[in-house]
């Protein structure tokens, strides 16, 4: 039996949810000690492919999220309620890409934990904060889109942007509170591998020997950062689907074209948020399942043939990929963001795209024409009031 197959369970922490930055993962120790033997063991080609993939995730993710943030702060028309949440998502993704992903990449070549006790606690805190910001922001976004679809013509309050910023800040605070126990209890533990008579250090949230703690930790992570938020999102989108189905029987007439476009705009944004939620669910599911499997099959997991190396790497890469896909999903779904993204990517000054009709405030509409007697241009300003005196909301739903 190869060394890879006979390693102790102390070296089997492979979950990003629990051990994104831990050095006791199978891949890191086996790479360092050249313990990968057998027909299906990765060689130098596999390591090169892994590092190229990690470098691609980091580079593409930083570029995409940085452009998204820049577009938001430089373009006044993009500073809307849903875009505030999406920009907060981008900050969380950048945090993960700049810290936890590079640290995880060191596991494949480095011997032991390289970043000390303080680094262990700080990186554990950052990792869980970033995951919390992602899933909790998507949950709040779904609630916001439900409200927008149910009441599509409701007037935006004057302090809507300020309240949304406060909500985004609250999400960060809640995520930090959930991540605080991880930082407090994470520590660097020293282990000995009897098969190779060597010791190594690992950053973990609990002692490896505590099986019950591992099971509780994996279940809590799965529930708090996956099942519960996605269940809430599913409820909101079920209500959105029901509302949209009913609204097809009561669509505004052509004479109310502004109302029609406003409703269609909000439907489109609801679909955009749903795509972001689906990407999160897809990217993080394998990692959560693998961590649960590891936690509840502690003894049998010592035989690593149960989980092929490619599946371990796939789950890690897929989870990290979620931090770089959102800007490109927006590029695909939003023509407005696509124009700004192209301009920033080409280092050109972004031209302001013309807002759709649904984003033009109709309470202050300028009309230009010619006075027949003089032939000169004449500008008159008229006030248009629709929907019981409520004016349209400017740019609220632009993405």
From Swiss-Prot:
Chain ranges on the Cytoplasmic side, renumbered to this chain: 64-82, 144-163, 242-272, 334-399
Name this polypeptide is given: Bombesin receptor subtype-3
Key words of the record: Cell membrane, Disulfide bond, G-protein coupled receptor, Glycoprotein, Lipoprotein, Membrane, Palmitate, Receptor, Transducer, Transmembrane, Transmembrane helix
PROSITE patterns: G_PROTEIN_RECEP_F1_1 (PS00237), G_PROTEIN_RECEP_F1_2 (PS50262)
Gene Ontology MF terms in the entry: bombesin receptor activity
Glycosylation sites: 10, 18, 29
Compartment(s) of residence: Cell membrane
Function: Role in sperm cell division, maturation, or function. This receptor mediates its action by association with G proteins that activate a phosphatidylinositol-calcium second messenger system.
Transmembrane segments: 42-63, 83-103, 122-143, 164-184, 221-241, 273-293, 314-333
Bilayer disposition of the protein: Multi-pass membrane protein
């Amino acid at each position: 039996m190869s060394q890879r197959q006979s390693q102790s369970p102390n070296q089997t922490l492979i979950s990003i949810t629990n051990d994104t930055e831990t050095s006791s993962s199978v891949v890191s120790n086996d790479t360092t000690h050249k313990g990968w033997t057998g027909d299906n063991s990765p060689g130098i080609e596999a390591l090169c492919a892994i590092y190229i993939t990690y470098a691609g995730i980091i580079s593409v993710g930083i570029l995409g999220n940085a452009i998204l943030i820049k577009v938001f702060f430089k373009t006044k028309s993009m500073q809307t309620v849903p875009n505030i949440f999406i920009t907060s998502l981008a900050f969380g993704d950048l945090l993960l890409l700049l810290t936890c992903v590079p640290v995880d990449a060191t596991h494949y070549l480095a011997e032991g934990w390289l970043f000390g006790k303080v680094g262990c606690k700080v990186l554990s805190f950052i990792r869980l904060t970033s995951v919390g910001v992602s899933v909790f922001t998507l949950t709040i976004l779904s609630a916001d889109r439900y409200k927008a679809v149910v009441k599509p013509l409701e007037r935006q309050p004057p302090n809507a942007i300020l309240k949304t910023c406060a909500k985004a800040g609250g999400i960060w605070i809640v995520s930090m509170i959930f991540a605080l126990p991880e930082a407090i209890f994470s520590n660097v533990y020293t282990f000995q591998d009897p098969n190779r008579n060597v010791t190594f250090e690992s950053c973990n949230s609990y002692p490896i020997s505590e099986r019950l703690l591992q099971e509780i930790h994996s279940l809590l992570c799965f529930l708090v950062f996956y099942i519960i938020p996605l269940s809430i999102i599913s409820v909101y989108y079920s209500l959105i689907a029901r509302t949209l189905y009913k609204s097809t029987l009561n669509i505004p007439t052509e004479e109310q074209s502004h109302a029609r476009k406003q409703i269609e705009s909000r439907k489109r944004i609801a679909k955009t948020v749903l795509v972001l939620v689906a990407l999160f669910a897809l990217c993080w599911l394998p990692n959560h399942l693998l961590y649960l499997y590891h936690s509840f099959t502690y003894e049998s997991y010592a035989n690593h043939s149960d989980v092929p190396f490619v599946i371990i790497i796939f789950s890690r890469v897929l989870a990290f990929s979620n931090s770089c896909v959102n800007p490109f999903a927006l590029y695909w779904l939003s023509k407005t963001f696509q124009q700004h993204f192209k301009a920033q990517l080409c280092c050109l000054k972004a031209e302001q795209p013309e807002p759709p009709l649904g984003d033009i405030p109709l309470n202050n509409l300028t009309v230009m024409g010619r006075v027949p007697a003089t032939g000169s241009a004449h500008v008159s300003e008229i006030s248009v009031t629709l929907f019981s005196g409520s004016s349209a909301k400017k740019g609220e739903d632009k993405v």
